[in-house]
C-alpha cells in the first residue's frame, strides 16, 4: 500500500473509530423498551447504569455523584455540554458563581456575561409516583447526547445543562412496585406500601429552605453554592383536568421580596414554552389563573430558587405508563389568556407526555442559548440590586403597609368630614403624604442585618437555623469579640447576617413575617387558598432570638466561608466542688443528651420548683457526678452541642425519669406527618416502635408501651366512624397486610381509652386531638357560632388561617411545657382550638398548656378573622384514669421545621 493510500486508510479508520466511540446506546438497547412505551417503567438501578453508560460513551457528558440519599444510594447529576465546554467546566462554574453572588463590578460582570455559558438545571423524579419526571429526563439526556441537528449543537455550545435525579430511592420503590405484576394491564401505581422518600414522601418538595433531608442538601449545594444556574426546571405531575400541562407564568400572589426580573423572566420563558408547543401542534398548555400554582411560597425545589435570583420553572403534566384519558371539562374548551390553545378530550399515552416534556426542555434550552448573555447579566443584576438595597435605607411594600396608608387617609377624612361621613364616594387617589408617612417612616424600614446573640438559652437551635441559611449560599459572620450595636452589648461568638448580599430576598423571607394579602374569590366570598403555606418565617418556627439592625453597622466580624457549616461544641466545666450537672430544658439538644445518658444506664432527674432568677428553666435535667457520669458528660459535650452546667449543690426538688417505651402511629402507604416525626425522634436519639391501626385494635397496649404519639390524620372525626379512606388492598404482598386499616371509633378508641386508664400517656397533634371528643372530655370546639339557636362551625368567610405562624401564651410551670417561653410561636393551619369547662379546670381534670391571649395572634402569614381566636385554648392536658392525654392543636412538629415547639413533644416522652 502506498504512503498516500495508507494515510487515507488511517484517516478513515480514525473517523470510523470515532463514530463507534460516540455511538450512544439507545434507551431500548439498555432498558429493553422505548421511553414512553405503555406499561413500562425503569428502575433507579437501571437508570443509574444507563446514565453511567451514555456518559462513558459521549464526550458531551460528565457523570457526577452529588451525595448519598437517605437510603444510601448515589444521587447523580450529569453535566451535558459541548466537548469544548467540558474541558473548561471549572472556568464556567466560577463565572456562574461570580455572577450569581454578584460581588464584582459592573464592567467585570458584563465581560463575564459575554464569556460565560448559560447554566440550566433540569431535574426529574422528585415525586416518584409522578413517573413522567424521571423518564423524560432519560429521554432528554439521550437526545442531547445523540442528536447532531443545528439546534442541539447550538444549545450544547451555549449552555451547560445539569441533568439531575431528584429522588433515586423513590424511583426504585415506585418502579419495582408498578412492574411487579407480570400482567401488564394489571400494573398500577396505586397502593404504594410506604412513603417514596424515607421520611417525607411528597413533602420532600417542602424541605428546600430547611434542608433536613439528604437529597435536599445534595441538590441545594449544587443550586446555591456550586453552580448557581440562571434557570432551573422542576418537572412534576399532574396538571388540572382538561389540560395537558400547567406551567409558567403562575397566578398571583407572587412573593414581594424577590426581584421583578424573576416575574418577567417567568413571563418570557413561559411564552417560549407555549410557543414551542403551539408550533409543534401540541395543545393543552395552561398558565396563570388556569392552575393553582403560584410563586408565593418559599421551600419548594422550584420556589426557593426565586429567592436566589434564579428563574424557577415548574410544569405539571398528565401521563401514566398505563394509558389514560383527558376528560371533558367544558370550562376549558374556549381559548383564553390562561389557555390559548385548549386540548380536546381524548385518549392519552405515556409517550405523548414524554414528547411534550422533551419539547418543553428544548424550549427552555433554546431560550437559554439565544439569550445566554442576558440571562448571565440579569442574575448578576438581581444580585447587585439586592446588595444595593442592603447597603441603604430601603422600604419594601406589602399589603399591611398599603392598609396602613388607607387607614390613615380614612381617619383624616373622618376628622375633616365627621365620623358619619361616608368615604364611599371619595377619590381613590390618596394624597402622597400618606405614602410618605409609611414609606419614609423608619419604623417600617427594612433591616440592614440581624444579630443572633450567643447567650440565648437555645443557641444550638439558632446555629441550626444559621446552617440552613448557609446551605443555601447565604454569608454569615461571626463576632470574634464582644461588641455594641445601637447601644446594646453583644457577646463574642454571636452571629451576624447582613442583608447586603445577593440572596437578600431569602434572608428577609426567613427572618421577617410573610404578609399574605387578603385573597378572596370575590368581595365577601370564600378565600382563595394559598398553594401551600401563607406564612413560614423560619426564625419564628425555630424559636430563634435575634435583633434587627436598622442602620449600617460593623464590628469585629469574621465571614464564614460560603457553604461551610457552623460547628458548635458543647461545654462542661468540672471542678472538685462539682456535685452534678444540669441540662437546661430550654435547649433542644439537652433532650438528646438526656437520651444518650439514659441509654448508658445513667440516672437522670427533672428539677421542679425552679426560681425565676435561676440560670436554667423549671423542668431542666440533673445528673449526679460520679466517675461514670463525668466521663459520659465530657464525651457528650465534645460530640454534641449540649451545654452542661456544673452545679456545686444538688437541687432539692427532683423527679427521677426513665426511658419511655414510645409507639408512633403510622398507616399503610405512610403518613408524612408520622414520617417527619420519625426523623425528629431519630435525630434526638429517641427509640420508638411504629404501630399500625391493627396493632392498636389488638389491645394489650399498656404492657408494651408507655407513650403513644398520634400525629395529624390518625384519629377520625367524632362525626365519622373511621375506617374508610383505603383503596382495594386485596392484592398487596402479605408482608404489608398488618399495616392496613384505619383507627375506628368502634375498635380502636376503646383500646386507646383502656391504655390511658391503665396509666399510659397519649400525645395527639393537629386533627388527632379529636380523641378528646371521642373520650368525652370536658372540652369543646372554640371555633363555632350560634345561629338560630344551633351551634355550627365558623364559615371560611369569617375565619380562615391557612398555614401561618401564630403566637400563643404558654404555662411553662407545667412539666408538659418545660423549657418553653411564656410567649411561643406556633405553626397553625386551621387547626383545632378548644374551650375548657371551667369546673373541670378548677378540679384539675384538664389544664390549659397554651392559649391565644389576645385578638391579634398573627405573626406571619394570613389569619382572616383572627379575633375569633382570642381566649381559645391551643393545647391542654387531661387526666384519664391513671394516664394523661396531651392535646396540641397546632402542628408542633411541622415538617421537622418547628423546632421552637419540639419540646412540647419531647417533654411527654419520659416516664416521670
Which residues does each PLM region occupy?
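Bacterial Sec-dependent N-terminal signal peptides
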Residues: 1-26
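Intrinsic-disorder/low-complexity accessory segments
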Residues: 22-131, 135-159, 206-207, 214, ...
